[in-house]
C-alpha cells in the first residue's frame, strides 16, 4: 500500500530547462528570447535554490539545463552548478562561449604605464619610427579596449572538477560574414567562441555544439564539422529553426525553403560518413512522426521572468491560446506550488504544433 501511495505522489521532472539570465553579449537574429547586452532580468540564487528544492521534494529532476541569455554572465552561475550537482542532478550548461573581459583597474593602470614607457623609449632611440610607434599604440589599445573574452581553461577545468556533465555551445557560422550577421557580433567575440570551444574540449569536458540550419549558414555545415574535428569535439546537434522572438521578426530571411532543407539533408548525409563524432538529428531531421513530444509531461522550461512553460517552443504562444488546450502557465514567484506534471508520457504530435496549427486555421 505504501508503495502505491509513493507512486502517486513522487513525480520526477525528467528535463528541466532553467533560463537564469536574460542578458547576452550577442544579438542573434534568431534568438527566441530577444536577449542582448542591455537586458536586465535575472534569477537570483535564492530563487533558483527554492525552485530546485521544490522539484526535488516532489520527485526529483532527471536533467537540469541552465541557459539564458548567457549563463556565464550570471554572478552565481558556479554556485548554481555546484548546488545542482550536490543533489545528484545531471547538469548541462548552454552557452555562447562569449563572456565579458574582466580587466581589473590596477591592471589597466599598469598597461597604460607600460604604454607610456614604450613610447618614451621610442622617442629616445627611434624618434622617426612612426611605424613602430603606431604598432605599439594599437597593440596596447587592443589590450585596453577589448570587451569580450573566452571561457578559460582554468574556468572549464573547475567546471569539470565540480561535476558539470556537459557544456553546449552555439556555433552557427563558419565564415566571418555569416557569423557576424547571424550572431550580431564581431571578430573578437567570434574568436572567443572558438577559444572557448577548444578549451572545453582540451580539459576533457563533454562538449556538444548546437547548429540551426538557416538560409545564410546551411551550406557551411561541412566546414563547421571540420572545425569540430580539429577541436576534437565529438558531438553536434542539428536543431530546427523556431520562429520566436527575433527569429519571428526575421523569419523570411532565415527559414529554409523545402528545397533548401532537402539540399541541407543531402549535405548532412554526405559529411556524416567522414565525421568521426556523432551527429544528433533533432526534430528537423527525425520527421514529425518520429519525434515524441514530452512538453509539460516530463519536461518544463522556466523563463528568466519566472514563467513556467511546457517547453521552450511555447515562448510565442499567448496565455489565451494555451488555456484552450488546458495549459496553465504558473510563475515561480507567485504560485510555484501549482507547477505539477504527470512525470511520464509522450505525444505523437507535438503539442506546440497542435496549437500553431489551430492558430493558422482560424
PLM regions: where:
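Flexible mid-to-C-terminal extensions adjoining Fe-S/redox cofactors in radical SAM and related proteins
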Residues: 5-11, 34, 307-308, 312-362
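Residue-level signal for mature regions of secreted extracellular proteins and peptides
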Residues: 17, 21-24, 286, 304, ...
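Radical SAM enzyme [4Fe-4S]-AdoMet core and its adjacent flexible, acidic
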Residues: 7, 11, 90, 112-146, ...
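Alpha-helix N-cap/loop-to-helix initiation residues
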Residues: 73, 100-101, 214-218, 328
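Conserved alpha-helical substructure of the radical SAM core
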Residues: 2-161, 165
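Short, intrinsically disordered, charge-biased short linear motifs at domain edges
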Residues: 12-19, 276-281, 334-341
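Short cysteine clusters
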Residues: 24, 28-31, 293, 311, ...
Amino acid at each position: 500500500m505504501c508503495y502505491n501511495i509513493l507512486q502517486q505522489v513522487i513525480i520526477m521532472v525528467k528535463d528541466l530547462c532553467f533560463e537564469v539570465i536574460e542578458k547576452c553579449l550577442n544579438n542573434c537574429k534568431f534568438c527566441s528570447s530577444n536577449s542582448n547586452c542591455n537586458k536586465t532580468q535575472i534569477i537570483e540564487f535564492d530563487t533558483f535554490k527554492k525552485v530546485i528544492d521544490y522539484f526535488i521534494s516532489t520527485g526529483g529532476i532527471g536533467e537540469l539545463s541552465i541557459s539564458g541569455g548567457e549563463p556565464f554572465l550570471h554572478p552565481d552561475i558556479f554556485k548554481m552548478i555546484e548546488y545542482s550537482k550536490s543533489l545528484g542532478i545531471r547538469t548541462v550548461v548552454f552557452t555562447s562561449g562569449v563572456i565579458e573581459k574582466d580587466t581589473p583597474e590596477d591592471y589597466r593602470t599598469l598597461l597604460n604605464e607600460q604604454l607610456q614607457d614604450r613610447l618614451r623609449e621610442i622617442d629616445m632611440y627611434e624618434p622617426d619610427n612612426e611605424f613602430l610607434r603606431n604598432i605599439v599604440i594599437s597593440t596596447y589599445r587592443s589590450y585596453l579596449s577589448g570587451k569580450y573574452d573566452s571561457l578559460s581553461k582554468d574556468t572549464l577545468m573547475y567546471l569539470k572538477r565540480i561535476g558539470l556533465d556537459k557544456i553546449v555551445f552555439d556555433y552557427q557560422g563558419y565564415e566571418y560574414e555569416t557569423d557576424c550577421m547571424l550572431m550580431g557580433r564581431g571578430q573578437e567575440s567570434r574568436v572567443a567562441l572558438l577559444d572557448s570551444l577548444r578549451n572545453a574540449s582540451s580539459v576533457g569536458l563533454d562538449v556538444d555544439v548546437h547548429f540551426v540550419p538557416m538560409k545564410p549558414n546551411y551550406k557551411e555545415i561541412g566546414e563547421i564539422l571540420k572545425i569540430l574535428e580539429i577541436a576534437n569535439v565529438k558531438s553536434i546537434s542539428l536543431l530546427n529553426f523556431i520562429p520566436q522572438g527575433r527569429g519571428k521578426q526575421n523569419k523570411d530571411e532565415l527559414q529554409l525553403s523545402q528545397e533548401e532543407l532537402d539540399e541541407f539533408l543531402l549535405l548532412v548525409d554526405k559529411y556524416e560518413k567522414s565525421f568521426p563524432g556523432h551527429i544528433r538529428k533533432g526534430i528537423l531531421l527525425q520527421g514529425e512522426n518520429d519525434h515524441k513530444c514530452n512538453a509539460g509531461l516530463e519536461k518544463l522550461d522556466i523563463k528568466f521572468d519566472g514563467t513556467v512553460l511546457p517547453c521552450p517552443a511555447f515562448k510565442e504562444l499567448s496565455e489565451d491560446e494555451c488555456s484552450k488546450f488546458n495549459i496553465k502557465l504558473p510563475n515561480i514567484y507567485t504560485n510555484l506550488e501549482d507547477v505539477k506534471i504527470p512525470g511520464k508520457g509522450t505525444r505523437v504530435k507535438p503539442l506546440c504544433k497542435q496549437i500553431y496549427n489551430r492558430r493558422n486555421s482560424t
